[in-house]
């Protein structure tokens, strides 16, 4: 298996492990510096990297994270101080990898479970957290199961912040006006889109410019066809058994109901099309509730949710925090991570942000966004969960290859059969 990014990271981390750490407040904020701050009584500086602009965002989850940063700096004034490093989602991992390569590993950074986290665990960039969780912190979480995707060889390398599910948002008023019913299977999905289009509405808004958005839909379609990722990875299965080809064919069929600008639209633009009532359906996830309600609070009353039709399981994921293995301020980092999972932050997660908390915190469902209750209904009716397809493959490179192939199929640059053949060739060379 070729893991070029892992080899690069491992080389860099081994060469620069002594450079990372925290600095005193007199120093310029950075992820590296002297460990003398704790002994001298100076303020310990740490950094936290995140995939949104905390100053400009209207996303309610991001606003909640900004509140955590403010609370942390106020509560630990004179002891610890955290400086955020922010960027947009599309540029997040390239910029994080650049910091790793330069030796300036952020002390704490957000990461998605799966191959993305693996890329920081295997080279030793992320630190195991078990010793810190053992002080009673772990007992505040709902169960050990919330750490399943963050655990490697029995050790936990990241802490989940929330749980979200991929789902379909829909404009209830548009559905009613078009005489469309909420679909429960694939034929009903196509029928609803046909009625919406006939009524003059754009049925679906989606981003192919942000490739994972389109590949998430492809992942659901693969699930509906019975694609077995584990068997394909170990060589007992193949991408060329007809299942991916059938899923990609359905993707092409569904794409005739996408907005005309889907090929170039980013995730943010596609989501805005929905809450600005320019399209009837947004295939996204409950992580978008904070963005939808933050940008257009009046839209909440007409925003319904249904499970992607034709599948029994739902895609679930969590935002997670990892700590640099070379930080010289682990106590400050853990204090920050604990604040992200304290009762104040977790209540906000549900009552304002519309995501599912990962701790045993009690929250008022009556004040939470209406969409959260709909998402909980989807969860309760599902027979299980699975991960994003591009985050469930042997490597980030394999996931990116799947993303690119699905976009190519949508654009007409590759047939479904060619995509299946291309994925099989990639796995044969890189993953087995």
Predicted segments, located by residue:
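Conserved N-terminal structural module of periplasmic/extracytoplasmic solute-binding proteins
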Residues: 7, 23-118, 122, 182, ...
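A structural signal for short loop-to-beta-strand junctions that line the ligand-binding cleft
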Residues: 99, 106-107, 138-173, 202-205, ...
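Conserved C-terminal helix/tail region of periplasmic/extracytoplasmic solute-binding proteins
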Residues: 176, 256, 380-432
């Amino acid at each position: 298996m070729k893991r070029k990014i892992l080899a690069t990271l491992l080389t860099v981390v081994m060469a620069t492990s002594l450079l990372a750490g925290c600095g005193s407040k007199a120093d310029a904020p950075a992820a590296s510096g002297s460990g003398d701050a704790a002994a001298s009584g100076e303020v310990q500086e740490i950094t936290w990297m995140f995939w949104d602009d905390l100053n400009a965002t209207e996303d309610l989850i991001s606003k909640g994270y900004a509140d955590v940063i403010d609370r942390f700096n106020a509560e630990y004034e004179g002891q610890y101080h955290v400086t955020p490093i922010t960027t947009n989602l599309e540029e997040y991992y390239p910029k994080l990898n650049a910091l790793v390569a330069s030796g300036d590993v952020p002390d704490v950074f957000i990461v998605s479970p799966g191959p993305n986290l693996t890329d920081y665990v295997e080279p030793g960039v992320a630190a195991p957290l078990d010793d810190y969780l053992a002080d009673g912190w772990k007992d505040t979480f709902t169960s050990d199961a919330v750490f399943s995707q963050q655990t490697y060889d029995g050790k936990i390398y990241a802490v989940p912040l929330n749980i979200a599910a991929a789902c379909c948002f829909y404009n209830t008023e548009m559905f009613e006006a078009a005489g469309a019913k909420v679909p429960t299977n694939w034929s009903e999905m196509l029928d609803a889109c046909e009625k919406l289009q006939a009524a003059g509405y754009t049925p679906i808004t989606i981003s192919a410019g942000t490739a994972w958005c389109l590949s998430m839909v492809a992942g659901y379609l693969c699930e509906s066809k019975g694609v077995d990722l584990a068997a394909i990875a170990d060589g007992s299965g193949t991408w060329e058994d007809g299942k991916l080809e059938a899923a990609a064919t359905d993707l092409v069929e569904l794409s005739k109901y996408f907005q005309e600008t889907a090929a170039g639209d980013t995730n943010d633009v596609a989501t805005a099309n929905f809450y600005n009532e320019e399209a009837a359906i947004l295939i996204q996830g409950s992580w978008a509730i904070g963005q939808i309600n933050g940008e257009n609070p009046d839209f909440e009353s007409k925003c319904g949710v249904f499970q992607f039709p034709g599948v029994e399981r739902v895609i679930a994921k969590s935002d997670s925090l990892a700590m640099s293995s070379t930080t010289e301020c682990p106590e400050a980092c853990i204090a920050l991570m604990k604040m992200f999972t304290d009762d104040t932050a977790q209540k906000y997660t549900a009552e304002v942000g519309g995501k599912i908390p990962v701790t045993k915190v009690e929250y008022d469902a009556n004040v939470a966004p209406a969409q959260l209750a709909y998402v909980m209904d989807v969860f309760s009716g599902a027979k299980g969960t699975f991960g994003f397809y591009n985050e469930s493959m042997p490597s980030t490179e394999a996931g990116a290859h799947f993303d690119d192939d699905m976009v190519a199929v949508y654009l007409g640059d590759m047939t479904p059969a060619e995509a299946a053949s291309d994925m099989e060739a990639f796995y044969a060379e890189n993953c087995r």
